[in-house]
Amino acid sequence: MKYSIPSYSFHGLHSEGKIDLFGYFETVKYRYHLDSADIWNMMFKSFDDDYLRKLREALDEREMYVANLCVDAAEVWDVDPEKREQFYRNGLDNLRAAAILGAQTVRIDMGGRTLDMSEEQFEYTVNRYKEYCAFAEEHGFMVGPENHWGTSRDPENIRKLVEAVDHPNFGILLHFENWDSEKENGDRLCAKYAFHTHLAAWVIPNCDEKLALLEEVGYKGHLGIEHHSSKNEYSQVAWQYATARNTYNLMQAKKLGV
């Protein structure tokens, strides 16, 4: 299993001005001994070429890569056309950043505040993701939503969207146990679409079940260790990561009869 630790896991430190993306790269590489960066876009200082290329240089110097770019404030759908346009422009900026940084996957939310989708919303969302997929294909990464909030927290909406977009560079960021409908079955229904994952602290008691599900569907991406509390983040992330990794190692040992 490959692991990543989203920079969002340190959003408390970031809000206090105690960590930026350069410090995050150091933290992931030398505190947690990972080569994978998992960037939350709200930690970008700008989209200027000079800044983004400095980030890329910092990654290359540490022999790191970007497993995922997690994009907020760029949701595809909003009922307000002006906000839709604003989010679209932000989405394009982040896709360009993903290309410069060499990201493997990009999460851009579906938007929509309710589980129900109008025909207008669905058609617009499908077409926008098709556009994003064309860019992703050109630059060698996957793109799609997370079951994060609103419309995306219904596995049936995810299924319909995946089938309608119908593109090899489209998939989802699967946030375990984060559904408003089909709460018991959502992960199982949508795991096959996943290109990246978020495993929160509250899912740790069921970590073995989630890891088994990923193996069952042939998942090749990273297990993203996302922490949310904003408190004692270095130690909390260390516990969460170590527990998930130990669970996986015990599962593999059991298979070998060790």
Spans of model-derived segments:
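N-terminal small/glycine-rich loop or linker at the start of catalytic domains
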Residues: M1-L13, V66-D78, G111-R113
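N-terminal substrate-binding region of glycoside hydrolase catalytic domains
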Residues: V28-S46
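A short, structure-level motif marking secondary-structure boundaries and short turns
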Residues: S9-H11, I39-N41, D78-D80, D116-S118, ...
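Histidine-acidic metal/acid-base catalytic patches
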Residues: M1-H33, D60, G102, T151-L174, ...
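Conserved beta-strand positions in the central sheet of alpha/beta enzyme cores
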Residues: S36-D38, N68-C70, R107, G144, ...
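Short histidine/acidic/glycine/proline-rich micro-motifs that form metal-
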Residues: H11-G12, N41-S46, A73-V76, G112-L115, ...
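Aromatic- and glycine-enriched glycan-recognition loops and surfaces
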Residues: I19, M43-L52, Q86
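Active-site acidic/histidine proton-transfer and metal-coordination neighborhood
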Residues: E16, E26, R53, A58-Y65, ...
